[in-house]
């Protein structure tokens, strides 16, 4: 019998689609799992293709699948088919997936080490398009970790980690570090303010205290009154004045 035909008793018949003639040419048998045909012959499918269900034709490997020699297999987690579906390849940067299908990770997430799943950006990191990067000094991730934002007022930090400045300190201009409150200033919660007239910072610069006896000043700075002087107001000593008529004194006290 001719190619694609089989028979016996002197009669040859073309084999149906999806089958091919046996070596002896006496019968038709289904194409093997890697082959297909429509004219009584079976041909191994090209790389990236596999037989359809009835093995009458070859078709591209399905979604998430790739292969050679007429056999398609599902790509493992973290991989997807190449463009010609002949092999599996790792998901691209910022992508992750299972079942041979890779998708870009949502903002605020990035692929895990296996690229099978997307995971939240690590502490101090933020990003979009599946890529997380450490926030610059003086900034920290926003709530959904999609972008970096300046440290809150009174806070400072490096490498994406902000913390509130201790009492008596405030952030530097770039909010990278905390620094002592300036001269005449005091405060808590990372916020320093100038002390009212007649007062000055305490030793820790965490609060303002009234000028000591015989001292007066403004703008958070107190100075001792000269001999022959006293404070203008003991409840708010803002300046030194001469002792009144008939009085004299030293150390800011007139009698």
What is each stretch, according to the model?
Residues 1-255:
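Disulfide-rich, cysteine-dense extracellular ectodomains and adjacent flexible linkers of secreted
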């Amino acid at each position: 019998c001719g190619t694609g035909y089989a028979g016996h008793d002197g009669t040859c018949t073309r084999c149906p689609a999806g089958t091919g003639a046996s070596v002896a040419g006496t019968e038709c048998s289904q194409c093997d799992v890697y082959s297909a045909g429509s004219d009584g012959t079976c041909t191994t499918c090209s790389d990236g293709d596999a037989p359809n269900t009835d093995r009458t034709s070859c078709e591209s490997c399905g979604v998430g699948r790739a292969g050679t020699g007429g056999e398609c297999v599902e790509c493992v987690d973290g991989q997807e088919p190449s463009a010609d579906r002949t092999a599996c390849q790792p998901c691209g940067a910022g992508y992750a997936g299972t079942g041979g299908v890779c998708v870009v990770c949502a903002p605020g997430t990035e692929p895990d080490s296996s690229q099978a799943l997307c995971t939240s950006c690590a502490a101090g990191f933020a990003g979009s398009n599946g890529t997380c990067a450490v926030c610059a000094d003086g900034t920290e991730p926003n709530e959904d970790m999609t972008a970096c934002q300046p440290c809150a007022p009174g806070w400072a930090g490096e490498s994406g980690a902000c913390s509130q400045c201790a009492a008596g300190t405030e952030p530097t201009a770039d909010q990278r570090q905390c620094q002592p409150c300036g001269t005449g200033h005091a405060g808590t919660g990372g916020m320093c303010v100038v002390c009212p007239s007649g007062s000055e910072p305490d030793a820790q610069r965490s609060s303002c205290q009234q000028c000591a006896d015989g001292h007066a000043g403004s703008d958070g700075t107190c100075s001792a009154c000269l001999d022959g002087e006293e404070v203008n107001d003991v409840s708010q000593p803002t300046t030194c004045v001469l002792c009144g008529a008939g009085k004299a004194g030293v150390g800011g006290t007139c009698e």
